[in-house]
């Protein structure tokens, strides 16, 4: 047996909207770990 014989599921992180794209309320803009991209005015942050 080996010590590195496991793999995690993909987390699908990153930016989810394109430049100048119209979005509706409640849509996901970025999925990230930590706060690499900081939220701006009228943007909420969820866990």
Curated annotation (Swiss-Prot):
Keyword Zinc: no
GO biological process: translation
Pfam families in the record: Ribosomal_L27
Any GO CC annotation of this UniProt entry: chloroplast
Location of the protein in the cell: Plastid, Chloroplast
Gene Ontology molecular function: structural constituent of ribosome
Record keywords, A-Z: Chloroplast, Plastid, Ribonucleoprotein, Ribosomal protein
UniProt record similarity statement: Belongs to the bacterial ribosomal protein bL27 family.
Designated name of the protein: Large ribosomal subunit protein bL27c-2
